[in-house]
């Protein structure tokens, strides 16, 4: 097992995946993106990891305070989302994300999983959002 995950690992893992870039989505939300389509000569991306700003829809039930360090990580489907949320780990969801294939995790709790586990979850998110041909090439190159 690798060392515990740390917040800095998120950007390192995302940047190592093919054809990713750091930009924004949903207006100004800091987001790791992968190509989705080209429109009017401009590359459009699909977000697979988002740094969510504090919002009234995401409140810590223990303190009543808005979470201020949330990461949103896409999942391939509801089954994958449920598996992460129900596992013994830091991933969870909130009613605002009902029907949306993504889990939440506090950056401050990433140390509860290993860096390898974080890399697997982020890579799965990338696979869920990247073009199928890119995913196929990436997975075949990894063996």
Task: Place the predicted regions along the sequence by residue.
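Charge-dense, helix-prone N-terminal extensions
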Residues: 1-143
């Amino acid at each position: 097992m690798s060392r515990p995950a740390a917040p800095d690992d998120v950007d390192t893992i995302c940047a190592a995946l093919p054809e990713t870039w750091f930009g924004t989505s949903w207006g100004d939300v800091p987001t790791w993106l992968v190509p989705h389509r080209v429109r009017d000569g401009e590359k459009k991306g699909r977000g697979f990891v988002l740094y969510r700003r504090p919002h009234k829809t995401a409140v810590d039930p223990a303190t009543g305070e808005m979470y201020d360090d949330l990461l949103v990580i896409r999942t391939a489907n509801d089954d994958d989302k449920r598996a992460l949320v129900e596992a013994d780990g830091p991933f969870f969801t909130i009613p605002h994300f009902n029907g949306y294939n993504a889990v939440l995790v506090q950056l401050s709790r990433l140390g509860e999983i290993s860096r390898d586990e974080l890399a697997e979850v982020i890579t799965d998110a990338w696979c869920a959002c990247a073009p199928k041909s890119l995913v196929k090439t990436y997975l075949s190159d990894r063996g």
